[in-house]
Amino acid sequence: MGKRAKMIAKIKELMEKYDRIRNIGICAHIDHGKTTLSDNLLAGAGMISKELAGEQLALDFDEEEAQRGITIFAANVSMVHTYEGNEYLINLIDTPGHVDFGGDVTRAMRAIDGAIVVVCAVEGVMPQTETVLRQALRERVKPVLFINKVDRLINELKLTPEELQSRFIKIINDINNLIRKMAPEEFKDKWLVRVEDGSVAFGSAYNNWAISVPFMKKSGITFKDIIKYCEEDRQDELAEKAPLHEVVLDMVIKHLPSPPEAQKYRIPHLWKGDLNSEAGKAMLNCDPNGPLAGVITKIIVDKHAGAVSVCRLFSGRIKQGDEVYMVNNQQKAKIQQVSVFMGPERIPVDSISAGNICALVGLKEASAGETICSPDKIIEPFEAITHISEPVITVAIEAKNTKDLPKLIEVLRQVAREDPTVKVEINEETGEHLLSGMGELHIEIITKLKIERDAGIPVEVGQPIVVYRETVTGQSPVVESKSPNKHNKLYFVVEPLEESVLQAYKEGRIPDVDTKRKLDDKIVQELIKAGMDPEEAKRVMCIYEGNVLINMTRGIVHLDEVKELIIQGFKEAMRNGPLAAEKCQGVKVKLMDAVLHEDAIHRGPAQMIPAARFGIRDAMMQANPVLLEPMQFVYINTPQDFMGAAMREISNRRGQILDMEQEGDMAIIKAKCPVAEMFGFAGAIRGATQGRCLWSIEFAGYEKVPRDMQEQLIKQIRERKGLKLE
């Protein structure tokens, strides 16, 4: 039996021992060393050859990733590690750190129970570290800390042992402050990372060594030895004495939970069904003999197998030929193949049981976030996976050859299924395909990689367009609106939605709702908690994309029969704002009164939808409407000498500097800029700092467009959309 075959046999055996499984992720800021760490862990566990590790970036197996030197898609791999005489199976997901790919990170968090947070010792805790940690804690994922690039503190920055210590203490305190701030109540103290119990490790992923307090006690190596090895350039010897994989994987096994342990507190948070039901109990206990329940966290498209779904099973087991039911899609599918991951390869297995992460072939229509169960025991779906960012840039895309059009439509649908942070729509008037993403790099990866390289369709990509929103800032008077046949009248008032309610909607605490009957009491309570007037909250008819329609009427005959049509009109008004036909957000529409014709034939869709739509639009025009533009936080890390140039670059783009820190000879600038001004920023900032800065961006919500620009901007958008210019 070759080494590889032994490894596969081991993995198959351990998959059935639930307390010996660890599902973990590695998360960090871009370039802090995630992928190098995961490769060297793989090499240590005998999965790829040692000579290549660190250079090979086994998990960056997409040629585009290897070229750019950044991880774009989350990759999966399984490995075996022995700790205190027992063997453990570790399923590792490497997630991207670049901000344009935040969606991948959020989805990976659903599949794992613990995370190694990697922080670069030189740069410290960065904005993206904070974002990723927040996502982990929100999904109830327990963290441990690995401080990377320690050799650079010793060799490049020449820090003394005292300075080293204070640098480490600062990083650990920063991480613990974030955990205190963001962890769920019951874990605020339990989950803090501590040097003394070994939930913090230090080392150099690139040079393949690491150290932790338990390992020092076990091996007798001290911090002084480490400084000596680094100064004398004998890090390869150090890697033999204190191997990275041993220290880090020991920490993972000791401090991160097994599936049965983690599911006890994760399931109540992730799944809103009845925990006392058969499925609920099976998931809490990670029971392989219970009803099937799993969540699909990612779709990978394979040239040979088609769509491969990455799935975390919470209960039951799944084997080839099984029929499963997809809850969100409401359809059945047959599993053609079940396999586990080893880097870029999938190894077919007979069956997979609860607690494991696997790859399934055969779920053609599945999208990320889908819940799967068995057709005879249908369960409640898992909560929608909430993404922190939303698409802010749109490009028009068309095939260079008309014959590629059907193929292009298929690829765009597939991309939207794989990545929920991408939106694809067809502009009805112009017939263009519009692709929206989270930033320039995100869009470029999709068009160059997924469409041109993988699908082989040459495309023309239009100029990037910024996605604006509309809202109101004042309250309108009561506006009367008549149906086209003049037999029905609706009376509306429009005002801004409470800021706190909009925030709760964005964080996913309040869902989209259409109600024909009474609103679910849970949602009413959430609305009141978020600051809505209790009387209004009880009368909500519809919540749609951050706008709310409230029925303030009393005792109107026939109103129930036209409710759906009024909701339809409200949605149309919210999709096309009055200023520039952009989507609205944060608008509260109240239906104050209605006079309806008693004959149903005179209050059909052709009468009621326009009455609602135009009435709401007129009311918005009298409620001081404004245009909102998307903003981004910009974080720049630059040498002091280039600080002025970097700040000029920001202020030339209507940016505001929010914060500035100095650490050694580096300046850290935190600013906020409109997305509209950020095109071409990558090249400009490189030029301004002679390529010596690191920068990243993060979505920062929508803000009002400056008044002096609004009129011109509305004119431009209307012109682009071919609307009348009045």
Swiss-Prot record:
GTP binds at residues 28-35, 94-98, 148-151. InterPro entries: EFG_II (IPR041095), EFG_III/V (IPR035647), EFG_V-like (IPR000640), EFTu-like_2 (IPR004161), G_TR_CS (IPR031157), P-loop_NTPase (IPR027417), Ribosomal_Su5_D2-typ_SF (IPR020568), Ribsml_uS5_D2-typ_fold_subgr (IPR014721). One of its GO terms (biological process) is translational elongation. It is found in: Cytoplasm. Its main location: cytoplasm. NCBIfam families: aEF-2, small_GTP. PANTHER family: ELONGATION FACTOR-LIKE GTPASE 1 (PTHR42908:SF3), TRANSLATION ELONGATION FACTOR-RELATED (PTHR42908). Belongs to the TRAFAC class translation factor GTPase superfamily. Classic translation factor GTPase family. EF-G/EF-2 subfamily. Catalyzes the GTP-dependent ribosomal translocation step during translation elongation. During this step, the ribosome changes from the pre-translocational (PRE) to the post-translocational (POST) state as the newly formed A-site-bound peptidyl-tRNA and P-site-bound deacylated tRNA move to the P and E sites, respectively. Catalyzes the coordinated movement of the two tRNA molecules, the mRNA and conformational changes in the ribosome. This is Elongation factor 2. It comes from Methanocaldococcus jannaschii (strain ATCC 43067 / DSM 2661 / JAL-1 / JCM 10045 / NBRC 100440) (Methanococcus jannaschii).
